[in-house]
Design a protein with these regions (language model features):
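Cell wall/extracellular polymer interaction/catalysis modules
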Residues: 1-169, 183-192, 198-202, 209-211
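Residues immediately within or flanking Cys/His clusters that coordinate Zn2+
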Residues: 172
Length: 213
């Protein structure tokens, strides 16, 4: 099942997509927030099989119940990978961070990101696992023998430009980064509504494209 980029789906189609993603979560033994509560967000990243570090070719999907408790699905174009300029010059001596696909429960909160301290989802509440790519080329290396765990600031944020950006370049050092500022702002609006209802704590699940087959 394919989703268009930066789209909102409601009604029967949203219910079908919800079932499709929740089945994938169930196969991985991950939790899904499917109770009858509005704005209880399922935030799911999908890493493209191409593993292209140069492009925003991954997907972030948010599945939740709206005001009328009907299911809504929103999707956004992102990268789940570090950009090529960071891969060439890692900021950590162990190598560049690449988030390991998993479900990370209650690990992010709304908080400041980066030098400009704008508001994003910040990894402040729990540890994550990352692959360490230390060969300083632009090919993504996801070696299970080189996994690091800790607080690495793997945030969910936008890139620095105000316009939609085509290439990642240095926009991601392992964070989950939106291609579109408009999409990011839409996503953060949902997060603020959810935080008012459930508290400032967010679960993020990163899947691989093959997990949905």
């Amino acid at each position: 099942m394919e989703l268009n980029i930066m789209t909102t789906i409601k009604g029967m189609h949203a219910e079908l997509i919800k079932d499709y993603f929740f089945s994938a979560l169930d196969r991985k033994k991950y939790s899904a927030f499917d109770g009858k509560k509005k704005y209880n967000l399922n935030i799911i990243g999908v890493r493209n099989n191409s593993h292209d570090s140069t492009k925003f070719d991954d997907l972030l999907v948010v599945i939740y119940r709206g005001e009328d408790l009907e299911w809504i699905v929103k999707s956004y174009e992102i990268t789940t990978d570090p950009g090529p300029s960071i891969l060439r010059k890692p900021i950590n001596e162990k190598g560049t961070a690449i988030l390991v696909p998993a479900q990370y429960r209650s690990t992010w909160k709304i908080g400041p990101h980066g030098k400009t301290r704008y508001i994003a989802l910040a990894q402040r509440l729990g540890k994550v696992k990352v692959f360490r790519d230390d060969d300083k080329d632009t090919k993504l290396e996801m070696d299970e023998r080189q996994i690091d765990e800790g607080f690495f600031g793997i945030n969910i944020h936008k890139h620095a430009s105000s316009y939609e950006r085509e290439f990642v370049r240095g926009a991601s050092a392992g964070c989950q980064v939106f291609k579109s500022t408009k999409g990011f702002n839409d996503f953060m609006e949902l997060c603020h509504i959810s935080a008012d209802l459930f508290g400032n704590s967010f679960t993020y699940t990163l899947l691989e494209e093959d997990d949905l087959k």
